[in-house]
Regions:
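Active-site/acyl-donor-binding loops of N-acyltransferases
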Residues: 118, 126-144, 226, 233-354
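Short amphipathic alpha-helix that is part of the acyltransferase structural core
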Residues: 1-62, 69-76, 142-184, 215-216
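Conserved GNAT acetyl-CoA-binding A-motif
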Residues: 96, 101-115, 239-250
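Conserved acetyl-CoA pyrophosphate-binding loop and the N-cap/start of the following alpha-helix
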Residues: 86-98, 108, 226-234
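Conserved acetyl-CoA binding element of GNAT-fold acetyltransferases
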Residues: 72-84, 215-225
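A glycine-centered beta-loop-beta connector
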Residues: 49-53, 201-205, 355-356
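Amide-forming acyltransferase catalytic core, primarily the GNAT-like/NAT-type
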Residues: 131-240, 280-297
């Protein structure tokens, strides 16, 4: 008989071996922040054991997002795996339903995950988020500042033991709208997905940091971001890269502006999948974040979410107020999926699926 259980530290080796097998990866290297014996309990692994061995697993990683002084708790869903010989038996449906209920019971307002849109749409997740990619080619450097202007920069690997560099990196990182990383887990967190952190220095002086894998920089923070073209040229020289791609999130307005002015080309992609459990709290937090980052005009919108509630979202010059109401006619009526696309993808009417 199949048994659903929450893994404990004693299950570390069995769970890790299982997901290594399903994904054909070495998770202790791929995701050091969780898949070591000392870090394993940072995540919750909900598993099904059938006939004495693991058949399926879903991991829940608690996360905190912070913008300035405001933060919100959420969850990242990962390591979604089923043994090849146990597929089609409904174990993933059982685990995902269980995890969703656990998060609802805890009051977690939303969860997100990476993966196939239509696979996870079955469980109520919708494609969400935007990220911008800016591509720099050798000609961008050669025809502007020249590579000689890049020779003074160097890149030192960042280790957890490098207290002085780590402190400088943390100060830059904490200026972002970001997933909270503590000083203790900063480097293991940065190394997730096989990225590698480097400190950027010029004549021995700290200039910032990059998070790089192959020809892609997933994070870049500089003391003076106007020097990004010099740093790009130095990265190309140091790492032997001809075409360098830099990722920046939509809310990083000034960073995107500078990168767009200096790069060869750019494109936009969606980010992942999201499921909202508490619409009031989620909308309230991200609308307030949007107000702080952008110049949103004061106003009020009544939104009816099919199968949920009707919400009043009121923006003033100083705050955003989100309430559940039942006395006013809605300005728009949307499904939960349409709401996520409307609020988090910036794709226009043809993406949101309704006429604004």
């Amino acid at each position: 008989m199949a048994e659903l259980f929450l893994a404990t530290n004693s299950d570390f080796r069995e769970v890790t071996d299982f997901i290594n097998m399903v994904f054909d990866k070495n998770f202790p290297e791929f995701m050091e922040k969780v898949y070591t014996e000392e870090n394993f309990m940072r995540a919750e692994h909900y598993c099904i054991r059938d006939e004495g061995r693991l058949a399926a697993c879903v991991a829940v990683y608690p996360q905190t997002i912070r913008c300035g002084d405001e933060s919100i708790e959420c969850a990242w869903i990962g390591s979604v795996s089923v043994s090849p010989d146990k597929r089609g038996m409904g174990y993933m449906k059982q685990l995902m339903a269980h995890v969703n209920q656990v998060l609802v019971d805890r009051g977690i307002p939303f969860a997100y995950l990476s993966g196939r849109r239509n696979r996870y749409g079955f469980y109520g997740y919708e494609i969400t988020g935007m990220r911008n990619y800016f591509t720099f080619e050798e000609e961008n450097i050669r025809l502007t500042i020249g590579f000689d202007a890049c020779n003074e920069y160097e890149f030192d690997p960042l280790y957890q033991e490098d207290k002085e560099d780590l402190e400088s990196v943390m100060k830059l990182y904490e200026k972002r709208l970001f997933m909270v990383r503590t000083a203790e887990d900063m480097v293991p967190g940065m190394k997730t997905w096989e990225y590698r952190p480097y400190v950027v220095k010029k004549k021995g002086e700290f200039q910032g940091y990059i998070l790089i894998k192959g020809d892609e920089i997933a994070e870049i923070e500089l003391v003076n971001f106007e020097n990004v073209l010099n740093v790009c040229g130095a990265v190309m020289l140091c790492f032997g890269i001809e075409n360098l791609k830099i990722e920046a999130r939509t809310w990083e307005i000034e960073k995107c502006r500078i990168l767009a002015e200096k790069c060869e080309r750019y494109h936009i992609e969606t980010l992942g999948n999201m499921k909202i459990f508490d619409f009031k709290k989620t909308l309230g937090y991200f609308m307030e974040t949007e107000r702080k980052i952008r110049n949103i005009k004061p106003g009020k919108l009544i939104v009816e979410v099919t199968g949920e509630d009707t919400f009043s979202i009121e923006v003033t010059e100083k705050t955003v107020k989100t309430d559940i109401i039942d006395s006013e006619k809605a300005d728009i009526s949307v499904t939960p999926s349409q709401l996520i696309r409307l609020c988090f993808t910036r794709g226009g009417d043809f993406i949101t699926g309704f006429d604004s």
